[in-house]
Amino acid sequence: MINVEIIKNYDKWREHKQINKSLIQKITQNILLRFNNFSKIKQFELSMLLTNTAEILTLNKQFRNIEKATNVLAFPSNELNWQDLYSKLEFLGDSDYMHLGDVAFCYEVIYNESCEQQKTFENHFIHLLIHSILHLIGFDHQNDTEAHIMENLEIEILSYFGISSPY
């Protein structure tokens, strides 16, 4: 079970009814099921903030010390490494619960990027959702090798949902 808490504090998000708890749960479940090590966990939790440029600017300044609006910010609750997902996850212990983390999405940046890249807003959001969930479970793109691995996994998951590669 994946419990998703969504806070929509920017009205433009309400125009996209298909971006809802059910979609987020379905995508998150698709990602987690790819890693057998998560199978013993019965309940996952994820918090989402669907917000605007002003709040993303504040979050970026506060947590990343940058003065720029970004499309998404992911705050993992656990220090996971993607390489450990393919081996034994002893650090999870006997817990059957995991809070994955918090994610904040910026409407205006996503909207502008989707227009520039000639994608639907929803498809671009789904890509960023996949990208952010992968960050929450330990994937990163600090070097070319990591970026390639993460991008290939994103492409595979997007394909499952009928969305073409953004790369």
From Swiss-Prot:
Subcellular location: Cytoplasm
Record bears the keyword Transmembrane: no
Family: Belongs to the endoribonuclease YbeY family.
UniProt cofactor note: Binds 1 zinc ion.
Residue sites binding Zn(2+) per the record: H131, H135, H141
NCBIfam families: rRNA maturation RNase YbeY
Function: Single strand-specific metallo-endoribonuclease involved in late-stage 70S ribosome quality control and in maturation of the 3' terminus of the 16S rRNA.
Cofactor (UniProt): Zn(2+)
Protein source organism: Rickettsia akari (strain Hartford)
Enzyme class: hydrolase
Keyword entries, A-Z: Cytoplasm, Endonuclease, Hydrolase, Metal-binding, Nuclease, Ribosome biogenesis, rRNA processing, Zinc
UniProt GO molecular function: metalloendopeptidase activity; RNA endonuclease activity; zinc ion binding
EC number: 3.1.-.-
Record-linked InterPro entries: MetalPrtase_cat_dom_sf_prd, YbeY, YbeY_CS
SUPFAM superfamilies in the record: Metalloproteases ('zincins'), catalytic domain
GO aspect biological process, one term: rRNA processing
Organism superkingdom: Bacteria
Gene Ontology CC terms, in alphabetical order: cytoplasm
UniProt-recorded name of the protein: Endoribonuclease YbeY
Lipoprotein in keyword set: no
